[in-house]
C-alpha cells in the first residue's frame, strides 16, 4: 500500500470511531449494539444464502413465504434482519431470468449474503448490467435463451434483492446441505446459475 492509501485508511478508521462515539454519546445506539451488528454482518456469507435457497427448493411453503416477504422468511431461519433494509426475492424460472445490480453504488443484501463480491461494486459491472446484460452474462458463461425475458432488478438503499435460482436438474433426492453447497453468490445475484460439479 502507498503512503496516500495508508493515510486514507487511517482517516477512514478515525472517522468510523468518531461516528460510533457520537452515536453512543447521544444514546442513539450503544457500543454493544454496534458490536452486535458488526458480528451479525461478519457472520453472513453466501453459504447462508445458499441454505436459504436450498430450503426454498425443498419446502414449497417456505418458497412461497420467501417470495412474498423475504425479510420475514429468512428471519424464520435465524437470519437477523433488524436494522437492515427489506429483502426482496425474485425467482428465475423458464420464462424469466433476473439479474441484480445496484446502479448507484453497491447496495447488497449483506445480512443474508455477507459482503458483496468486488465486481458487484465495480462501475463496469453496474453499467454493463443495464446497457448489455446478455453480453455481460455470456462472459460469465450464462446464456439466457432468446425466448426468456431478462429482467434487471435494481437493489437500493431502501430495498435489497436476491435471486432464487432454478434448481438444477439431477438434484432430486438431495438433502438441503448438499443443495446449499452448489449455490454461489453469483447464482443469487443472477450472473451465474447453479451447476452440479
Predicted region positions:
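Terminal, compositionally biased segments used for targeting/anchoring and flexible tails
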Residues: 1-197
